[in-house]
Amino acid sequence: MQLHELKETIRTATYEEAVAALTDYITANPGDDEALTTRGMRHWGAGKRSLAINDYLAAIAINPASRAREALRAATEILDYRNTDLYNP
């Protein structure tokens, strides 16, 4: 299955189904930064921030120009804004 076909399939899938399908795809295609970014976005949408960031970092390691770079930047800005009291007690 190609990634664009998988994206259509997971569009209506539950979080667990989508992540399982993406994980299977990533296992078979470990160099696919777009798949890692897509899985990271599903993690982010489910509130699993650390899993999302790990996927973004893995995607950037594969392809520094990956759109995961922008996703990571946005995630960092959101976390910095939302958790300022944790960093500056």
Short names for language-model regions:
Residues 11, 49-51, 76-89:
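Alpha-helical linker/edge segments of TPR/alpha-solenoid repeat scaffolds
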Residues 30, 63-64:
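Short coil turns that delineate tetratricopeptide repeat
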Residues 33-34, 66-67:
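Helix-start (N-cap) detector for alpha-helical repeat units in TPR-like alpha-solenoids
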